[in-house]
Amino acid sequence: MAKKYFGTDGIRGAVNSKNINGDMFFKFGLATGTYFKTQKKKKQIAIIAKDTRLSGYSLEPALVSGLTSAGMHVYTLGPLPTNGLAMLTKSMKANMGIMITASHNPYHDNGLKLFGPDGLKLSNKIEKKIETLIDQKIEKSLSKPKKLGRVKRLETANKDYIKILKNNLPKDFNLRGLRIVIDCANGAGYKAGPELLKSLGAKVFSIGINPNGLNINKNCGSTFPNKIRLAVKRYKAHIGISLDGDADRIIMCDEKGIVIDGDQIIAAIAMRWKRKKMLKGGVVGTLMSNYGLEKFFKLHNIKFLRSNVGDRFVKEKMQKNNFNLGGEQSGHIILGKFATTGDGLLVALEVLFSLRKGKKASSFFNTFNKTPQILENIDVKDKNIIKNIDIKNSIKLAEKLIKGQGRILVRSSGTESKIRVMGESDNIKLLQKCLKIVLRKIK
């Protein structure tokens, strides 16, 4: 049975719409609190972090109210990268962690990402159980007055997160001599990002660090890489780091101003880990990973598997196959040895490990030639139109025409009202012809 509230990465939508409003966030809090209370712990604890959206100020109190009404004690952490929340959920031995964010989306959207006590995103099975609790009568979940939860603010969350990141580094690790540009997307990483790099001795040029509630991801961050590209050239930096709104994605830029996507970052890290005998099993990508990446790994005898789109599915396939590296072209990259979910700053440190020894970013990222890829995102009112027989037939025809020379992938977004149509081939004319066949049926 399809889920009612949860998508591919938590719950997301327009603020004050059907699911993203104070009333629903109270219900989400009450339902998740009720579910996690079943764990046999002496103290029932939930921790909440958020990005910098204006709507966070109205949604967070509603969520807290629901959790405390279920008898959960709550720590609010303020703006913090998503993986910072995942790490602190585990280190604080909390029952759960909840991130209020809509990731790379504009300010007018918001949502929730939920983590269990192990720092992992919730499984489909648990999400369905929570959905059942959301829809039941409220009286069944309310705690008695003397069993209501309490709320505390944790002011040290960003420092605690940075400390955990640095604990993974050698004691003598430093970035002295490196000039680094970081774009924090006016989002959750605006404090931790620059502070981490400066504490390691780098000369840091920070942009996207002045959030006003409305400018998160606006012409900045990982979905707008031109900003970091221009900044790297302006400041003559060795490398550029571009995060998204909740800092779980990273796109980079080398010293020449060339933008490096998630596939290229994964390839470079995989090769370094293989040389150091750190790579375990192989690498997990997604349906959207470039075909050139697949060919590159085959050439270097590295096993490569594809999962559905979404870093949760990447992590699940990594766990199932005992791999320790995986990620998405969009910049969600999971370093399984150190983290349970994507973390832009953690990935940046892994890359900077090589640069601090004098290697140029352009050399580090010189791995594979990408197969030309065209991606179209079409806004639609109903994502189910993808099941239309005419659209299905157009996809079959396009796949037949391009077979052996590339691939066509058509999928609905799990977080937005969009249909994504992607094609890859070295034969550009054929690729454009095949995409046109599909697009004219959808549009």
Swiss-Prot record:
Binds 1 Mg(2+) ion per subunit. It is an enzyme of class 5 (isomerase). SUPFAM superfamilies: Phosphoglucomutase, C-terminal domain, Phosphoglucomutase, first 3 domains. Its EC number is 5.4.2.10. Pfam families: PGM_PMM_I, PGM_PMM_II, PGM_PMM_III, PGM_PMM_IV. Mg(2+) binds at residues 103, 244, 246, 248. The modification Phosphoserine is found at residue 103. GO terms for cellular component: cytosol. Disulfide bonds: none annotated. Keywords: Isomerase, Magnesium, Metal-binding, Phosphoprotein. The active site is at 103 (phosphoserine intermediate). It catalyses: alpha-D-glucosamine 1-phosphate = D-glucosamine 6-phosphate. Activated by phosphorylation. The keyword S-adenosyl-L-methionine does not apply. Its cofactor is Mg(2+). GO terms for molecular function: magnesium ion binding; phosphoglucosamine mutase activity; phosphomannomutase activity. InterPro entries: A-D-PHexomutase_a/b/a-I, A-D-PHexomutase_a/b/a-I/II/III, A-D-PHexomutase_a/b/a-II, A-D-PHexomutase_a/b/a-III, A-D-PHexomutase_C, A-D-PHexomutase_C_sf, A-D-PHexomutase_CS, Alpha-D-phosphohexomutase_SF. GO terms for biological process: carbohydrate metabolic process; peptidoglycan biosynthetic process; UDP-N-acetylglucosamine biosynthetic process. Belongs to the phosphohexose mutase family. Catalyzes the conversion of glucosamine-6-phosphate to glucosamine-1-phosphate. NCBIfam families: glmM, PRK10887.1. This is Phosphoglucosamine mutase. It comes from Pelagibacter ubique (strain HTCC1062). The gene is glmM.
